[in-house]
């Protein structure tokens, strides 16, 4: 029995797509094929896929909703798991529990509907709840670490564990999940009671700021670089004269130099080449070495 036949038998009922192009699913609109793209409907299907992959020695990874990543043009071998169907969100008092695939922006809107404060900072951050925990996503002075109460994960060995914020060892755009290989299943956020109108006004203010400053009209991978201590990446790039700098179909945004946008059918290689070139030119200009925030995954073509 071939691996494909065994997969279809053991993982019957699970949505699996073979040799699926990933550019359709990424915010950058680039990326080659996944050998097996999987859409589990619940944590049990996810656990079945991970168990099968481990037993068959097939590599696997979870992409969240592919908002802060670049998939290389050669694609990704093995299983790529998208969790956007694991998207239930519930509210219990001042606590919101969200599955990993829940949309982060929509989760902040649910907090607003229940007049819960603390989540406003994330009202414009694209991505999934699971991805936000993985990266300790943040903006405008807030971050996931400030509101996370606990997190349920599937370990790389297929066990389910509940972790505290302390267990996750949050840092700037970092969590322990990045090293552990675990997969976020669901998250509990501890919020506080607030006034609906006040929360809405703050979310509207932050959304307006984001629309003014960020090139939301183009495909992009979000913030490309981490914030250097004492500096802003976008400012350093701008001071090096790199706004509008372009390689292939990808360019440094004129609107916000911390973003790289796909303006003309760019490729993952265009992104990688532009990122490396910007790092080198900023280093030459300011002496500061920028560090990538965006993850680059897969194989070159």
UniProtKB/Swiss-Prot annotation:
Molecular-function annotations in GO: FAD binding; UDP-N-acetylmuramate dehydrogenase activity
Positions of the catalytic residues: 173, 223, 293
Catalysis performed (reactions): UDP-N-acetyl-alpha-D-muramate + NADP(+) = UDP-N-acetyl-3-O-(1-carboxyvinyl)-alpha-D-glucosamine + NADPH + H(+)
Signal peptide interval: none
Keywords attached to this entry: Cell cycle, Cell division, Cell shape, Cell wall biogenesis/degradation, Cytoplasm, FAD, Flavoprotein, NADP, Oxidoreductase, Peptidoglycan synthesis
EC category: oxidoreductase
Primary residence: cytoplasm
Record keyword Transmembrane helix present: no
Any one biological process term the GO annotation gives: peptidoglycan biosynthetic process
GO cellular component, one term: cytosol
Domain of life: Bacteria
Required cofactor names: FAD
Keyword Cytoplasm: yes
EC number: 1.3.1.98
InterPro entries linked to this entry: FAD-bd_PCMH, FAD-bd_PCMH-like_sf, FAD-bd_PCMH_sub1, FAD-bd_PCMH_sub2, MurB, MurB_C, MurB_C_sf, Oxid_FAD_bind_N
Pathway it works in: Cell wall biogenesis; peptidoglycan biosynthesis
Annotated ranges, domain FAD-binding PCMH-type: 30-194
Family: Belongs to the MurB family.
Function noted in UniProt: Cell wall formation.
Name of the molecule in the record: UDP-N-acetylenolpyruvoylglucosamine reductase
Gene that encodes the chain: murB
């Amino acid at each position: 029995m071939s691996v494909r036949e065994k997969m279809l038998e053991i993982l019957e009922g699970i949505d699996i797509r073979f040799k699926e192009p990933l550019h359709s699913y990424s915010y950058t609109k680039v990326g080659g094929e996944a050998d097996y793209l999987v859409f589990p409907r619940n944590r049990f299907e996810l656990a079945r896929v991970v168990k099968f992959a481990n037993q068959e020695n097939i590599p696997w990874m979870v992409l969240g909703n592919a908002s802060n990543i670049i998939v290389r043009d050669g694609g990704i071998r093995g299983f790529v798991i998208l969790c956007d169907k694991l998207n239930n969100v519930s509210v219990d008092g001042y606590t919101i529990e969200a599955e990993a695939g829940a949309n982060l922006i929509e989760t902040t809107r649910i907090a607003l509907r229940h007049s819960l404060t603390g989540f406003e900072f994330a009202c414009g951050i694209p991505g999934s709840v699971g991805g936000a925990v993985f990266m300790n996503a943040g903006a405008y002075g807030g971050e996931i670490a400030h509101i996370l109460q606990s997190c349920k994960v599937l370990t790389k060995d297929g066990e389910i564990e509940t972790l505290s914020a302390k267990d996750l060892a949050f840092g700037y755009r970092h969590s322990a999940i990045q090293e552990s290989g675990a997969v976020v299943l669901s998250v509990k956020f501890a919020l506080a009671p607030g006034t609906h109108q006040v929360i809405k006004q703050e979310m509207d203010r932050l959304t307006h700021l984001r629309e003014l400053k960020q090139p939301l009209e183009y495909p992009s991978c979000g913030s490309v670089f981490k914030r250097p201590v004492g500096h802003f990446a976008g400012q350093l790039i701008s001071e090096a004269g790199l706004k509008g700098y372009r390689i292939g179909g990808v360019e440094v945004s004129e609107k916000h130099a911390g973003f790289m946008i796909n303006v003309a059918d760019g490729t993952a290689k265009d992104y990688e080449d532009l990122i490396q070139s910007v790092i080198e030119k900023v280093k030459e200009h300011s002496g500061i070495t920028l560090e990538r925030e965006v993850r680059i995954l897969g194989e070159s073509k």
